[in-house]
Regions:
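Nucleotide-sugar-dependent
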Residues: 292-308, 320-322, 326-327
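A charged, aromatic-enriched C-terminal amphipathic alpha-helix characteristic of glycosyltransferases
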Residues: 18-22, 340-350, 354-389
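Short N-terminal targeting/anchoring amphipathic segment
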Residues: 84-86, 93-117, 131-133, 289
Length: 390
């Protein structure tokens, strides 16, 4: 932990008013413990700043400033090479103006696409000698799912830009185990990836709540009901189940790409209106198993906020096996059932034995508890201070 007074500059150009609020709070808490004497300045669009500021009112030494978000001009899409480049250049100018002449310990870009990777990350050594951490949320995973047919647009997206090396002072910050290794396979020349396991807020922890003695086991899909998160698989799973001792729920908001699905079999359906964080967490506390049919390759490159919510509530998983879950299990032990395919998922649920679940559950919950403890901001702070290295 450093005692000299320095400054940490944080920039979130991508998040809308409510996007990534829990993580941004968690990250601020990690930084506050890691560098207790530093001044922290957080910049984002005005609505995001207004929502985040009261969440960290108990922390001192943090200033908030509104800034222009990543906005392609002329109504252009962020996938448009010209629009994305112009928006990224504007973000870079904002960062340059904010850090010039400051006693900077660290700058962090809280979300990065291909445009920001090129304009800010690859050019950072021209801006500052301080370290820059670019936090990888779902942008690389999204780029693995959909890519433009336009060759110029493809050359500027993150799936292409990730192959370009970064200055030594710039790190791409992965938020889950296994992501670094997945990027190493995709882009062997990129040696800039470091890992900060996704923090989990102590204020959102739940105590263990065993299933009701003779009630139904409640299996839930969490978060935005997008196809890429596997909601269509979950809806089909619920519709195909003929078991009266299982109850299927969707806790989160509806998504346009799955709006056509039949969800009449769900005891709780995706919400048509915004859902408060408190209502969401209360609903998660009331279920028994979290189903994460993350079948897309995107989740080899993405930290799942849904998994963090399951850990916070100590809820075991039924999930598709992927690189991140393999890495989590290798470090902490099993946290539920992992399946290889949709067919295996359907078979597992059709044959799920309550007694077998109850017998395995104590070990799973103990491992979830170990993950939760390790990912407290206070526990992550020392390692992150070393990672920053200043």
């Amino acid at each position: 932990m450093a005692a000299d007074l320095r400054e940490i500059a944080l920039f979130d150009f991508i998040s809308h008013e409510t996007m990534h609020l829990p993580f941004n709070e968690e990250y601020l808490r990690v930084l506050r413990v890691a560098f207790p004497s530093d001044r922290i300045v957080f910049r984002a669009r005005a609505g995001h700043v207004a929502n985040l500021k009261p969440r960290v009112a108990d922390l001192g030494g943090i200033d908030f400033e509104a800034c222009e978000p990543f906005t392609p001009p002329f109504g252009l899409s962020s996938h448009n090479p010209l629009g994305g480049w112009l928006a990224a250049q504007n973000c870079r100018r904002t960062m340059e103006g904010a850090v010039q002449g400051r006693p900077l310990r660290l700058a962090a870009l809280l979300g990065v696409d291909g445009n920001l990777y090129a304009a800010v990350g690859r050019q950072w050594s021209k801006v500052s000698s301080a370290p820059l951490h670019m936090i990888l949320h779902g942008q690389l995973g999204d780029a693995m799912i959909w890519r433009s047919r336009n060759p110029i647009a493809r050359a500027t997206d993150l799936a292409s830009q990730i192959h370009h090396s970064l200055p030594a002072s710039v790190k791409l910050l992965a938020l889950e185990l296994g992501v670094k290794e997945a990027i190493a396979e995709l882009a062997p020349n990129n040696r800039s990836v470091v890992t900060l396991e996704h923090p989990i807020l102590v204020s959102e922890w739940s105590e263990e709540s065993p299933p009701a003695g003779d009630g139904k086991l409640k299996v839930a899909f969490l978060g935005n009901a997008r196809r890429s998160k596997g909601f269509e698989v979950f809806a089909n799973l619920a519709r195909s189940s003929e078991r009266d001792d299982l109850q299927f729920e969707s806790i989160g908001v509806a998504a346009p790409d799955t709006d056509h699905l039949d969800v009449s079999m769900l005891a709780r359906r995706p919400s048509r209106t915004a859902m408060s964080r408190r209502d969401y967490l209360d609903a998660v506390r009331a279920i028994d198993l979290v189903c994460l049919p993350l079948h897309s390759r995107a989740y080899d490159f993405t930290a799942s906020g849904t998994f963090a919510d399951a850990v916070s509530a100590l809820k075991p998983l039924i999930a598709f096996r992927n690189r991140t879950f393999d890495a989590i299990v290798a470090k902490y032990g099993p946290v539920g059932w992992l399946v290889e395919s949709e067919a295996e998922l359907f078979y597992l649920v059709s044959t799920l034995d309550r007694d077998a679940f109850l017998a395995a559950r104590p070990e799973w919950v103990a491992n979830l508890r170990a993950i939760r403890e390790a990912r407290r901001p206070e526990m992550l702070a020392a390692g992150y201070s070393t990672l920053v290295g200043r």
